[in-house]
């Protein structure tokens, strides 16, 4: 089932956040043949869209007027409904300390501009696959935990019922 969903990549939603129309156009050209893509030209709009749309992945520029990419990821990670969305920084900032800060704030990857379209596609696919597999694993754990609790409750009920049959004719067994 996982491979079927991953092969249907257009089922996944990506939010691209960048204040430069040229960068948005490039990323749209790379991603839209494969994914459903929404665009936000500012950090504030990105947060609004993310709350309504809950994307599977966010590509986020760092240097933007108003809320920076660092501000946006902090807000995303502090919101329980949005904190599991993978965020990939796509930025012209190529310094090691910028990358380090991005990872410390919760980014899953970091792509420097100018971008390589095959690299962007590969990284997006990888992180969507990982996030999808994590969701599927969490669902399976919940399902198995519920089954285990049901079995445990059934065993307790059977033991309680067996206690009612404890009499002198059975040697108190």
What name fits each language-model region?
Residues 48, 70-83:
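Short amphipathic alpha-helix used as the core "switch/output" element in two-component signaling
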Residues 122, 129-157, 161, 165-168, ...:
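Amphipathic alpha-helical coiled-coil "transmission" helices that mediate dimerization
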Residues 97, 111-124, 128:
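C-terminal output helix
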Residues 1-15:
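Non-catalytic signal-transmission and effector/linker regions of two-component phosphorelay proteins
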């Amino acid at each position: 089932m996982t491979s079927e969903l991953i092969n249907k990549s257009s089922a996944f939603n990506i939010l691209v956040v960048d204040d430069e129309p040229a960068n948005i156009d490039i990323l749209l050209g790379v991603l839209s043949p494969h994914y459903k893509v929404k665009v936000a030209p500012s950090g504030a709009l990105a947060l609004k869209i993310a709350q309504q749309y809950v994307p599977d992945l966010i590509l986020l520029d760092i240097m933007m007027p108003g809320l920076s990419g660092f501000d946006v990821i902090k807000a995303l990670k502090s919101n329980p409904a949005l904190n599991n969305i993978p965020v990939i920084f796509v930025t012209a900032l190529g310094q090691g300390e910028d990358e380090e800060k991005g990872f410390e704030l919760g980014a899953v990857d970091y792509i420097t501009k100018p971008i390589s379209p095959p690299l962007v596609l590969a990284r997006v696919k990888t992180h969507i696959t990982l996030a999808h597999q994590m969701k599927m694993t969490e669902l399976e754990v919940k399902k198995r935990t519920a089954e285990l609790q049901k079995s445990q409750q059934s065993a307790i009920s059977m033991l309680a019922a067996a206690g009612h049959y404890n009499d002198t004719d059975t040697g108190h067994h």
